Amino acid sequence: MILDILPRVGLKPKDYFLKFVLPAVLASLFMVVLGFIYFDGITRLLVLALPLLLLGGALGYPYIELDSQKQKINERLHVYITKFGVLSITDLDNKALLELLSVEKEELGQLAEESRKIYVLVKRWNQSLAGSCRFLANRTPSSQFGDFLDRMAYSIDSGQELKEFLAGEQDIVMDEYAGFYERALYSLDNFKEMYVSAITSVSFFVTFAIIAPFLLPYDFVTMVTVAIFIFMIIEVILIYSIKNKLPYDRLWHTGEKPTAIDRKLRKWLIISVGLTILASIVLFWGKYIYEAPQLLKIPYELIFSIAMTPLMLGGYMAQREESLVIRKENNFPDFLRSLGDSVSAKGGGTLESLGYLCTNDFGPLTKDLVALHRRLSIRINGQKSWKYFGHDTCSYLIQLFSEMYERCTYLGGNSGQASHIIGKNFRKILRLRRSKYQNVNQFAGVMYGLSGGMALTLFASYGVASMVNGLYSSLDIPDTMLSMVHVVAPSDFGFISYMMYGTLIIYALCSSYLIKLMDGGHYQVSLLHFSTMVWISSIVAVVTEMVTNSLLKATIPV
């Protein structure tokens, strides 16, 4: 029942009725009256269908919100169990531990709110920790988190210490997270097939829109515009669906202040965008205004591709920094376990052990370790030193887990145990990421292939339509048959060519954004994918124009 779901998503029945149901009902009544008074035919049916969407959205909101909260819990469960386990080996009592988890909203997201609920039950309502866990286990949106709370309640009742329970739960919860992650990757494969099918179908629809005006009394520009509009809607829906299904797994850090690498990438972005703007002005002014003979011979598709080429520079620099960040992540677990074991064995502070480790080679991470040692040796603020270390690596995972380690040792936890927990879970996350990168690379290859396939389909159809239009224009058609033959003005046909190429540019934009959305990397790399897809589309389009012009002897504007 919907009333049973409302408390689980933090809504009171009264608030739900006033904020969602009542406005939807009033808006629906208004649209029904409007539809019957001012519209008729198909337009009336469309207007009368809108109230169904509004009422369906109001009734389905609690279920959508419940699923959203479940997704937010499951995608951060690995961070939660790692931080919970690491902090449990400190000198904090259970209440202080829950209070600390409840304020980590940036790291834990919805799980911080779930921890706050347990803390409120224990602190303000004087409930036992086991009873509070059982109470929340029956109300949390995530069954995985609910099972974890049930197990924790049982272990506490049986007299087991919390840190012992959490040490044993690390593998269990991480395996559950791995299952959740792998299911998301499997759904990504399904979305890949859906994406290919949808783009292929829309391409044929645009092709039909090009040919149909010769057979039916429809305007060319209108048909192609409608087809492109539908194409854009489908692209947005697919991107939104994929974005909601993918787990939160970003690569880049979330620091407030830009690092040296961030400033470097921003500099290259400004340079590449500036060169693109300059090249666009020079090339298009020279072709269409100055009408330079050399540029007039070059198809407009290649002119646009040349103008967009400088964007590859900014994208390539970001991709190179991404690869360095990934290498840093691969070296981080080994460094942290070495540091924790060294500190535990010597029984001393972190500074001496870190100074020794800085002499070893940890790949690209070594430079950041030297900077960390230099900050810690000043002995001003150790917490900020570790925080800046995480930001300087530009890795979200290193930022997250290095701060966990620092917090544990600061609160009196055993550095060796903390480093082993973090290092083990870190490696599991890296293994899952490798699978994701492989899937995303396959998806990117499909998108590159589709960009060429779309260009071939659209411009081959355009060549056929241009040939038919030229044939109709050259015939001496009797006046009685003029209404049966549809001829397009040459200027309109050139405009349709630009619209089709614009469709390919929109596809390149959406696909390049989608690639970086899926792999969680720096969005500046999408410039490299965009420029590459533009070149593929342009070359295929130009070659297709030349072939159709040669085979069909069609006059296709360049």
Curated annotation (Swiss-Prot):
The keyword Membrane applies. The chain crosses the membrane at residues 17-37, 45-65, 196-216, 220-240, 269-289, 298-318, 443-463, 495-515, 527-547. Pfam families: T2SSF. One of its GO terms (cellular component) is plasma membrane. It is found in: Cell membrane; Archaeal flagellum. It is a multi-pass membrane protein. Its main location: membrane. This is Flagella accessory protein J.
